Amino acid sequence: QNVELLCELHGMQKEERRSLAQASIELVGLEGFESHYPKSLSGGMKMRASLARTLTLKPPVFLFDEPFGAVDEITREHLNDETQQLFLNEGFAGLFITHSITEAVFMSTKVLVMSARPGNIVAEFDIPFEYPRKPDLRFDAEFARISGEVSKELRGGHS
């Protein structure tokens, strides 16, 4: 029911809602958890359920505002890998807002660094890595160099 909510709010019939919700649940790997209450799901599973809910509407662009900030680092990496596959398989684009430099560089084709107040763009980085990105990219020397440059900009250009 939770995953069907947006479809219901958009006036879709029950049968169509159920079909779209089930397809989205399968896309994010939550089969078998359809009848579980949100409080019984792990943090990563809650993020997947949220993504499934949005996927039911098949938007061309997703806004991700700190979507994985509440999960541990390993779960975050798994969710990044899975979300990247969804980008590729489902053909949508995403605007990713994050405080994690590693996540920004891994998930993006372009990273924009913003100042605190007022929030202005102070730096822009084109990320050269091809999709699909392999998890081990996070240990690549060029990945580390770019992440370091982003970090430097976040500190106001100081080492």
Describe the residue ranges of each PLM region.
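Conserved ABC ATPase "signature" region
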Residues: E4, E8, E15-G32, Q85
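Conserved ABC ATPase signature
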Residues: Y37-L41, M45
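A short, proline-enriched helix->beta-strand linker immediately N-terminal to the Walker B motif
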Residues: T56-P60
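Catalytic Walker B motif of ABC-type/P-loop ATPase nucleotide-binding domains
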Residues: F62-D65
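Helical segment within the ABC ATPase nucleotide-binding domain
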Residues: R76-E90
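Conserved H-loop
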Residues: G91-I97
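Conserved beta-strand-loop-alpha-helix hinge in the C-terminal portion
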Residues: A116-I146
